[in-house]
């Protein structure tokens, strides 16, 4: 990860004659202070909880009830999903979509219905052919000019295009076509359609974080004249109930973090535990994954500390015994590493030992071994980067990529995310994940290449660090912008791979695959305008505020 260099002040707790001139990343302190240390009072009373259950049953009945046509059914299911409450109705929605998949006359559908049907079915793994859009093209192979006046249809085609896989040229064309015409139309549209279009052009449904998108759509949906009052009320209550649960979890994590006292002991490291929780709540937000969220947040917090130790403070000579200690994973190794490394090493081992204790009741200790091995591989990759920096070595782009992909940490996070899941995860799941399957490769490429572009474009990297963009520019003799374009094409290709892996039959259950999808979504949200984790950009601030601070008025 990136850092900007300054000298370690002589007053630092880590300062000595040996390391007064150490490079240190000039990271901002946490912008949240102790805001999340204490959990707020419960914002839902017993009467509201009872109302929540009543509304839940009402919505369930509406999902399965016959409607006038498939367009109404699709639109209602879409609203349920976009409002963030579809996790309550997984089976009902799946049954309805399966029925729509097998019983539908595509020839009669307009652009809106064709597009929303395509998107929803693709989201649920149905391999709907993109040929359904051919009827909206003219004899010259261009989209008909008549569709440009159908703004809602264009908006749905735009959203559907983000579910494309390799070889679907018509959807590649649709992205450009709809983006152009929606951009022209947005200023003349009335609210709330204008807000829907404006937001979509910034963030597609497919690549947005479900909770962030739900929070935004709640404010839009209530202004749609035809909105369903029961669904809206249910979604608002459900949002606040989840927010309270998430605040409780974050409060517990913040107390753990404060007790570690890394702000004083390790002043070179980023204090981003709140942003880390936001990241992981993007991986899975549902109540049943509370344990997984807390464990994975602690892991990403420790991975961030380990990363900063390698990247922003330690000498290569210190990193060799530190890496050896991580490889051996034994508290006895603590005597072999420098004094300042001991707190982070002990905390790292403690986090994984706590994981063992938490999953032992269900005989799932084996899962933690896979998680440990993934962390060890991450540390080993960090050491390679540190060696390159020491030697001022400029690897070829392919050599750099082979090591840089593991250093983004996404394979480690994907594997570790499975530890806190239920019976849907088996030993075969971990064997599959450890084999570097295509979907984990895809999310890793999205992470690595978006990070590389953000670091270089926004100058978030130390001058002595090896840069993927610089490697590519030097090897191929291209400008920075040309390199960005190549990297962005790799990201788009990886998204197509990721979409392909969701089409039935899948290698693993959708709930397993969703972890990689959501990890990719976090990158799209946080890193499109720079490193939004390290430098806490607008997306992170806005997301944390709307999801964890501000409840919805009922």
Swiss-Prot record:
Keywords: Lyase, Magnesium, Metal-binding. Mg(2+) 3 binds at residues 451, 455. A motif (DDXXD motif) lies at residues 307-311. The keyword DNA-binding does not apply. Mg(2+) 2 binds at residues 307, 311. Its EC number is 4.2.3.13. Its cofactor is Mg(2+). One of its GO terms (biological process) is diterpenoid biosynthetic process. Residues 1-23 are annotated as: Disordered. Binds 3 Mg(2+) ions per subunit. One of its GO terms (molecular function) is magnesium ion binding. Responsible for the cyclization of trans,trans-farnesyl diphosphate (FPP) to (+)-delta cadinene. Belongs to the terpene synthase family. This is (+)-delta-cadinene synthase isozyme XC1. It comes from Gossypium arboreum. The lineage of its organism: Eukaryota, Viridiplantae, Streptophyta, Embryophyta, Tracheophyta.
